[in-house]
């Protein structure tokens, strides 16, 4: 799946449909990410400013370190987009998908400074939410009722 702009995201129901894929309104999601980026002080990222030329372009890939359930991609997408409106983002897994270790989840291409400055905020959300989603999936799998094909419904008395 390749999604690069808000209209395409909305058309695919990626995260603007409240309650369906992500329980925040578009306005709330944008405000949450803006607050996280401000808290991270990305506007004063002196390391990136000192080591990366302003016109430098970069490509990067978000890859899962271990198997689990990926979550938080809408937040990562928004973090990268808020710091570089010209960034191209290709979402390669659905939010909520089960992934194996070393699975490519998202590909980015854009200004290196924007990508590097948004990276920590994006990864913090994805790692935290993926951990919660993975643990939840494990609990659901553990308590799921398993029935074989020979189980039949009994008539009620």
What are the roles of these predicted feature ranges?
Residues 2-157:
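Acidic/glycine-rich phosphate/pyrophosphate-binding loops and surrounding catalytic core
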């Amino acid at each position: 799946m390749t999604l690069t702009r808000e209209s395409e995201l909305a058309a695919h129901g990626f995260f603007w449909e409240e309650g369906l894929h992500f329980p925040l309104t578009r306005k709330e999601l944008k405000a949450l990410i803006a607050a996280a980026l401000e808290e991270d002080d990305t506007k004063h990222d002196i390391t990136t400013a000192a080591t990366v030329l302003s016109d430098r372009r970069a490509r990067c890939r978000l890859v899962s370190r271990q198997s689990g359930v990926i979550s938080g991609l809408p937040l990562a997408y928004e973090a990268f987009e808020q710091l570089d409106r010209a960034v191209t983002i290709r979402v390669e897994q659905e939010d909520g998908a089960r992934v194996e270790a070393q699975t490519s989840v998202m590909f980015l291409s854009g200004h290196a400074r924007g990508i590097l400055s948004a990276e920590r905020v994006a990864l913090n959300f994805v790692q935290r939410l993926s951990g919660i989603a993975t643990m939840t999936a494990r609990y659901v799998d553990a308590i799921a009722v398993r029935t074989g094909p020979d189980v039949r419904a009994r008539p009620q008395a």
